[in-house]
UniProtKB/Swiss-Prot annotation:
Sequence ranges assigned to domain CTCK in this UniProt record: 37-127
Protein name per UniProt: Bursicon
UniProt source species: Manduca sexta (Tobacco hawkmoth)
Gene that encodes the chain: burs
PROSITE patterns documented for this protein: CTCK_2
Cellular-component GO terms for this entry: extracellular space
Localization in the cell: Secreted
Top-level taxonomy: Eukaryota, Metazoa, Ecdysozoa, Arthropoda, Hexapoda
Entry-linked Pfam families: DAN
Main location: secreted
Quaternary structure, from the entry: Heterodimer of burs and pburs.
Keyword entries, A-Z: Disulfide bond, Hormone, Secreted, Signal
């Protein structure tokens, strides 16, 4: 009887050691076509108090990314979590002029406002992007192409 208990305990111990040596990876789940994270053209309505709203072409990051929770391969009493979100990988800045008819001063009838658009989109760990990741469009090579050409500033 004790020999069977010993063999069972030894089997469980060696199985646990074997599991801990092999890293366990999450199963890749393919999203249906068209649902992956991608940069999508949108119309952005810029608003400022006292000014007329202005519609401009822009981009947004839209789509789904894989997230999961599973038992840890190295610590079977713990769970591993991975959360990915469809986010921008860098940003572009633009300055747009809005017409403000209610301004008392003639000089303030046209107000410059800044806006941002993603440079590209990708699945990244959920959280906010660092301000240092913003790349001026001249560096990114977008200064002379695309629907945003007239909206983005040409020099700093």
């Amino acid at each position: 009887m004790y020999a069977l208990d010993f063999l069972f305990i030894a089997f469980v111990y060696f199985a646990a050691c074997h599991i801990q040596e092999k890293p366990v990876r999450a199963q890749e789940v393919q999203l249906p076509p068209g649902q992956e994270c991608q940069m999508t053209p949108v119309i952005h309505i810029l608003k400022h108090r006292g000014c007329k709203p202005k519609a401009i072409p822009s981009f947004a990051c839209i789509g789904k990314c894989t997230s999961y929770v599973q038992v840890s391969g190295s610590k079977i009493w713990q769970m591993e979590r991975t959360c990915n979100c469809c986010q921008e990988a860098g940003e572009r800045e633009a300055t747009v002029v809005l017409y403000c008819p209610d301004a008392k001063n003639e000089e303030r009838r046209f107000r410059k406002v800044s806006t941002k658009a993603p440079l590209e989109c990708m699945c990244r760990p959920c959280g906010s992007i660092e301000e240092s990741a913003i790349i001026p469009q001249e560096v990114a090579g977008y200064a002379e192409e695309g629907p945003l050409y007239n909206h983005f500033r040409k020099s700093f």
